[in-house]
Structure formats: C-alpha cells, structure tokens
C-alpha cells in the first residue's frame, strides 16, 4: 500500500498497479479476486490528502503533519489487511531516517522520499 499519482495505491510484487482506494485485485488476470475497500472509512480521504498535497502544495506539510498522515495510513492498512486472505501479504511503505524529511522547494515532488523497506502488515 503505497500512494502514487493517478489514484494508484496498491501494487503487485512486480510493481504493477492493481488498485486504488475503492478496490484492488489479487491474482492472475482473468482469475483474480476483487477486494472492495469502499467500507473502510477514511481511506479515500487519506489518499486524496496525499494527492492534493503532492500535486498542488509540495513541501507544504510540516514534519508532524507528514507523520500524522503516515500513521493514519498505517491504521488504514491494518483495516485493509482484515479483508484479505491470510496467505496474501500486504506491505505498507516506510521511509528511512530522517523519516519526515522533505525535498527542497525546487524539487516540487510532494515531500515523501528516502524510502526504506516496506513494512509487512499482520
């Protein structure tokens, strides 16, 4: 679970987008399972906060705002995991230290970078 442009939020192990804040698909094309996310309160809003911030207000959030947003996303990822089969892993993005560092203004890149290893959601 890692937000990106174009409503992309979920990715398979090869890095292909498999869904957004409404649903995602697990499995092979033609034989996949749809995971409906519309009942997860706040997921769409959480994603759209990132989308607006990264596209229209790069580097506008403070470090504490990024941290709060990331922590809310972690809670949402745990809710998403409850809708999935136990044999399917869900990874949530992390950032290396300094965790909440943002790019300089001229980078115009939304603030999140310095990715670390994804966190497995149990």
Q: Where in this protein do the model-derived segments appear?
A:
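Intrinsic low-complexity, intrinsically disordered or marginally ordered coil/linker segments
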Residues: 1-122
């Amino acid at each position: 679970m890692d937000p990106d442009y174009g409503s992309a939020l979920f990715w398979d192990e090869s890095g292909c987008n498999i869904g957004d804040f409404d649903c995602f698909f697990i499995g092979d094309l033609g034989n996949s399972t749809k995971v409906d996310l519309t009942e997860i309160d706040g997921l769409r809003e959480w994603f759209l906060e990132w989308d607006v911030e990264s596209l229209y207000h790069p580097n506008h959030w403070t470090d504490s705002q990024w941290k709060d947003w990331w922590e809310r996303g972690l809670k949402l990822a745990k809710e998403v995991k409850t809708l999935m089969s136990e044999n399917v892993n869900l990874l949530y993005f992390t950032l290396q230290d300094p965790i909440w560092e943002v790019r300089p203004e001229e980078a115009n890149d939304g603030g999140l970078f310095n990715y670390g290893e994804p966190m497995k959601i149990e």
